[in-house]
C-alpha cells in the first residue's frame, strides 16, 4: 500500500503520516476534487514539477515482468514533444505520476510510479501530448548483458542483485530485506535479459522484486494470506461493481523446487504442499495431486529450495476465487496488497484476497478496476 504525501501549505503538513492517511481516507469516501500531477526526471533528478495531467491510466500486473505501465495525456502547449531536448520525449526522460485529492491550501496525493518514457506524440490542433511509458524495470531490462557477467560463489543474494542492477542501470535507491542466502557461481551470457535474471534470483529466495510508486527498487517476501490486510473492497463503502470467477487452472497444491546448477555435486530439492485438511484444494483424492515443478540454477541448498517452493505455492494455492471489481478510486492501492472483500449476497464476508492486477484512471470520470484472488473457495 502506497503512502500519501501532502503538498502545499495545508493543515496536514506537520502531521505524522498515519494522520495524513486517515484524512485521505475520509476525503475520498465523499465528494472531492481530483488532483493529479506529473513530474519529469532526467538522470534520476527532477527537472520539472507539477505538469498538468488531463487523462490516462496506470496499469499494474504482478504476473508481468514489467509490472506497471501508463498512458498519459498532458495539456501543456509549451512542452510539446518534438525535439530531442523536449522533456516529454523518449530520450531518457521519466514521468513521476501522482493522483489524489485537492484540499484547502494544497493536495494530498499518492505516488503511482516513475515511468521512463517509451513513446510520445502530439496532436497538432489541440497540442495535447500523449505519452506511453513503463516502470523503471524497463530500463534494467533494456540493459542486456553486453559481456559475460559472473557472480562469485558465496555472495549474499541481496548484495548480488543490487550489484547486478547497478552494473546495467546505476543510480537507483534500493529497499531490500536482509537475507542469509548466498549464491553459487552464477554466469550470465551476452544478450540475456538482466531484469528477468534479477526476478529469477529474487524468486529463488522467496521474494518478489519491483519498482514502487517513488521509483525505488523494492524486494520483499511474496504476499501470503497470513499477511495483515491493508484495505478492503466492501459493499456500501467502495464497491461499485463485482464479478466473481472460479478457475482451477492456475491453482496448484504442491510445488517441487530443484536446483539446475551444474556446479553442485549432488541433487538439491525441496517442496511445499497444501496439507491443510480444511482446504478444498488439499493435496489428495478430492482435488487431485496437482504439482508444479520449479527449477533454477540459483537454488543451491534444501532450505533455499523449500523457501522458493513455499513462496510459489503461496501465490498459487487453492482454486482461485477471482474477483473483478470496479471500486472507488484509491491511489494508495497497489498490486500484491492483501485486502478483505465483503459482499453478503455472494457469501463474501471479509474474505482475504491478494491484488493481482489493477487499472487506475487519471481523469476525473475514469474509474479504478482491480482483479483480486482469494486463497481458496470455502467448502
Predicted regions, residues:
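Acidic, small/polar-enriched beta strand-loop surface segments
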Residues: 1-45, 199, 203, 210-213, ...
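Surface-exposed cap/loop segments at beta↔alpha junctions
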Residues: 2, 6-10, 79-172, 374-379
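Extracellular/virion structural assembly segments
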Residues: 34, 52-94, 140, 153-155, ...
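Short, charged, low-hydrophobicity "junction" segments
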Residues: 38-54, 66, 104, 309-310
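Extracellular/luminal ectodomains and secreted, surface-exposed scaffolds of diverse proteins
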Residues: 45-62, 209, 238-241
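Short beta-strand and beta-hairpin "edge-sheet" elements
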Residues: 52-53, 98-133, 210-212, 340-370
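Oligomerization/assembly interface segments of phage tail-like spikes and tubes
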Residues: 60-81, 117, 127-138, 257, ...
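Charged- and aromatic-enriched interaction segments used to assemble
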Residues: 123-248
Amino acid at each position: 500500500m502506497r503512502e500519501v504525501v501532502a503538498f502545499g501549505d495545508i493543515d496536514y503538513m506537520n502531521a505524522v503520516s498515519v494522520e495524513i492517511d486517515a484524512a485521505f481516507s475520509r476525503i475520498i469516501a465523499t465528494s472531492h476534487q481530483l488532483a493529479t500531477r506529473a513530474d519529469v526526471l532526467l538522470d534520476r533528478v527532477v527537472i520539472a514539477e507539477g505538469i498538468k495531467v488531463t487523462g490516462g491510466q496506470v496499469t499494474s500486473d504482478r504476473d508481468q515482468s514489467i509490472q506497471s505501465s501508463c498512458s498519459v495525456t498532458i495539456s501543456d502547449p509549451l512542452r510539446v514533444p518534438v525535439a530531442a531536448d523536449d522533456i516529454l520525449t523518449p530520450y531518457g526522460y521519466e514521468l513521476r505520476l501522482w493522483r489524489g485529492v485537492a484540499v484547502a491550501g494544497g493536495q494530498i496525493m499518492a505516488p503511482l510510479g516513475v515511468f521512463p518514457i517509451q513513446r510520445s506524440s502530439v496532436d497538432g490542433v489541440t497540442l495535447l501530448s500523449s505519452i506511453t511509458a513503463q516502470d523503471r524495470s524497463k530500463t534494467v531490462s533494456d540493459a542486456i548483458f553486453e559481456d559475460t557477467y559472473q557472480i562469485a560463489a558465496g555472495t549474499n543474494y541481496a548484495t548480488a542483485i543490487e550489484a547486478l542492477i547497478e552494473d546495467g542501470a546505476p543510480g537507483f535507491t534500493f529497499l531490500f530485506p536482509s537475507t542469509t542466502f548466498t549464491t553459487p557461481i552464477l554466469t550470465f551470457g551476452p544478450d540475456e535479459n538482466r531484469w528477468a535474471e534479477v526476478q529469477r534470483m529474487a524468486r529463488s529466495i522467496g521474494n518478489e522484486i519491483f519498482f514502487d510508486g517513488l521509483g525505488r527498487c523494492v524486494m520483499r517476501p511474496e504476499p501470503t494470506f497470513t499477511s495483515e490486510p491493508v484495505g478492503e473492497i466492501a459493499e456500501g463503502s467502495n464497491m461499485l461493481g463485482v464479478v466473481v470467477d472460479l478457475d482451477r487452472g492456475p491453482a496448484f497444491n504442491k510445488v517441487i523446487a530443484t536446483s539446475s546448477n551444474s556446479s553442485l555435486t549432488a541433487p538439491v530439492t525441496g517442496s511445499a504442499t497444501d496439507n491443510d485438511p480444511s482446504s478444498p484444494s488439499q493435496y489428495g483424492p478430492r482435488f487431485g495431486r496437482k504439482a508444479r515443478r520449479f527449477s533454477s540454477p540459483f537454488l543451491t541448498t534444501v532450505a533455499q529450495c523449500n523457501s522458493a517452493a513455499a513462496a510459489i505455492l503461496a501465490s498459487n494455492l487453492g482454486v482461485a476465487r477471482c474477483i473483478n471489481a470496479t471500486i472507488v478510486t484509491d491511489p494508495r492501492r497497489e498490486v500484491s496488497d492483501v485486502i478483505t472483500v465483503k459482499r453478503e449476497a455472494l457469501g463474501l464476508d471479509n474474505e482475504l484476497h491478494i491484488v493481482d492486477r489493477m487499472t487506475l484512471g487519471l481523469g476525473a470520470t475514469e474509474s479504478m478496476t482491480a482483479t483480486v484472488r482469494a486463497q481458496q473457495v470455502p467448502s
